[in-house]
């Protein structure tokens, strides 16, 4: 198992949930946290603990976004019209690394970030190597021609464990995807329940 995989599954173990729905997640085999003391029974979490856990889970899901970056996204969500929690999810789902993952161009959020950083992705015909780039409805995302036959791409398109959500139109024969609309929380195919309202409560303390 690579260091990247170890870090990814450590998030699962810490949360005690298979947050990406992966068949190889260690929490499919055990229900306790990482480390030698992970089997100890945990007490009931305080309201603060529940809110913090919700934040850590969502940050972890999106490839362990840094606290500084995540808080910036929260502030941006609060400036938009509508529900802050819904806006938070909308911004996260518009990230280029998220769209590349959702389109099944790569198999994990972590791989999506690396794939973009290495210059394998174009948006509307222009190379974009910033994982946090905000995609807009109507944008077309594509894998560069020279990258379409990479093993990481070919393997990801065959994954049976998840489907492309309906707010993205993906054509794997051309390795292109069109971002149709900004999704609501209920549209996003999370493998576990995400609770952005608890994150709003956390930052509103």
UniProtKB/Swiss-Prot annotation:
This is Small ribosomal subunit protein uS4. Residues 94-154 form the S4 RNA-binding domain. The keyword Ribosomal protein applies. Residues 18-46 are annotated as: Disordered. GO terms for cellular component: small ribosomal subunit. One of the primary rRNA binding proteins, it binds directly to 16S rRNA where it nucleates assembly of the body of the 30S subunit. Part of the 30S ribosomal subunit. Contacts protein S5. The interaction surface between S4 and S5 is involved in control of translational fidelity. Pfam families: Ribosomal_S4, S4. The gene is rpsD.
């Amino acid at each position: 198992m690579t260091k990247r995989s170890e870090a990814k599954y450590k998030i699962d173990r810490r949360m005690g949930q298979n947050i990406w729905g992966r068949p190889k997640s260690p929490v499919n085999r055990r229900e306790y946290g990482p480390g030698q003391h992970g089997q100890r029974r945990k007490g009931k979490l305080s309201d603060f603990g529940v809110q913090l856990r919700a934040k850590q889970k969502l940050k972890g899901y999106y490839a362990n976004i840094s606290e500084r970056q995540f808080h910036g996204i929260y502030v941006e969500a609060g400036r938009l019209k509508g529900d802050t929690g819904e806006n938070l999810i909308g911004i996260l789902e518009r990230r280029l690394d998220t769209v590349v993952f959702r389109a099944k161009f790569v198999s994990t959020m972590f791989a999506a970030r690396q794939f973009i950083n290495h210059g394998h992705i174009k948006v509307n015909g222009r190379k974009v190597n910033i994982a946090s780039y905000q995609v807009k409805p109507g944008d077309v995302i594509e894998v560069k021609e020279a990258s379409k036959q990479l093993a990481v791409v070919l393997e990801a398109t065959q994954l049976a464990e998840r489907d492309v959500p309906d707010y993205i139109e993906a054509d794997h024969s051309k390795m292109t995807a069109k971002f149709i609309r900004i999704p609501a929380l209920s549209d996003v195919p999370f493998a576990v329940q995400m609770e952005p309202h608890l994150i709003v409560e956390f930052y509103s303390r």
